[in-house]
Amino acid sequence: MVNANTTQVSYAARATADYAVATYQNAMVDSLRALVKHNTVAKEGVSINDNPAHTAFKAELKKQARALGLDYKDDGYVVVIGLGTQKQRVGIITHGDVQPVNPKKWAKSPFELDITTEPGRLIGRGTEDDKGPISTALYAMKAIKDKSIALNKRIELYIYMAEESDWEPLKAYIKTHELPQTNITIDAEYPVVTAEKGYGTVKLVFNKQEKPTILPYVSEFSGGFFGSQIPEDASATIENANIVLLQRLMRKARSYQGVSFDLELKGSTLTVNALGKSAHSSKPEDGVNAIPYLADLLSSTRWESNGPGTLVNFINDNIGLGLEGKMFGNIAYKDDFMGAMTFSPTVIKQHDKSIELNINLR
């Protein structure tokens, strides 16, 4: 049933959409294949404008835009591909960068469009977030052009190159460029998202210290790959370990659901790996965070405050297995419209003299 106040999609829009699918389905896949092959992950300390992969990706965008008869403008961190010359504009907002990737988790290269591993699916880094929508938008604009649809607004496809890592260049761009009067973001679930969670990061640094002891101690603790991913992997190394500790941890490991542990004792070195389930950090409930679960497995011991051990103790004392930060002081917050703020430890970064825990807030 269609609500009486709902504007129905016009015949011209439906016909043009059907035409785009019938005419350009294969071309859209080829377009996506050409975009996916560029590893547009941000490199720490390297500007997008100095990153060869991003430069090559933008060159591919320019090539595709020109081939489709669309205009192209490169403003550094922002690429604009347009159709029409009208004063009023509608913006289609996307991004060309992608999150880091662990190739070991992929059947094929993440930067090669895989159409065979799961028939009917297009698999590759960025196919959904957000290179697939770019290819779709390009050929939607091409179909409109083919059909000579009379536009009352110019269409502008915006492709930001640092959505996953740095929003400051976008803020600067907005200050110096007049934005379209209407904007649509195709970087979310369909059909419509009315609001998006805010993003914040808490960074905690624990100094590494040499503290000789004959007791078992945590010498390494690691996990996570990127700030906005719920990590499915985490690992810990315990020195001065023994069979008694191994057996105690193995018994406890069997009590968990949704996460598995692999424990291996070689001499007096015990390695513990946790395997949870990855998810986007805006929906931590869809995953199982390996970092706090591994810390929880180790919680029966109060570890030496040497850096990694301090971190394990801190996670157990102040974060736990909850998703809302209720153990982290008074930070927990709930909004009637957006629901509870989520609080997820997502990355542990190793430095020469310290270990850093990044906590993602949404």
Language-model segments: which ranges?
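Predominant activation on well-ordered alpha-helical scaffold segments within soluble catalytic domains
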Residues: K62, S135-K142, K171, V205, ...
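N-terminal helical capping/dimerization or prosegment-like subdomains
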Residues: V2-T94, Q99-N102, E356-I359
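Sec-exported extracytoplasmic/periplasmic mature domains
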Residues: R33-V41, R66-A67, K142-D146, S299-N306
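Metal-dependent amide/peptide-bond hydrolase catalytic core
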Residues: M1-R14, D18, A22-T23, D30, ...
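A short glycine/serine-rich beta->alpha loop
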Residues: P119-E128, P191, G224, S278-P284
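Active-site metal-coordination/substrate-binding segment of hydrolases
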Residues: R89-I159, E163-S165
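Acidic/histidine-rich catalytic neighborhood of metal-dependent amide-processing enzymes
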Residues: D130-Q209, Q247, G320-T342
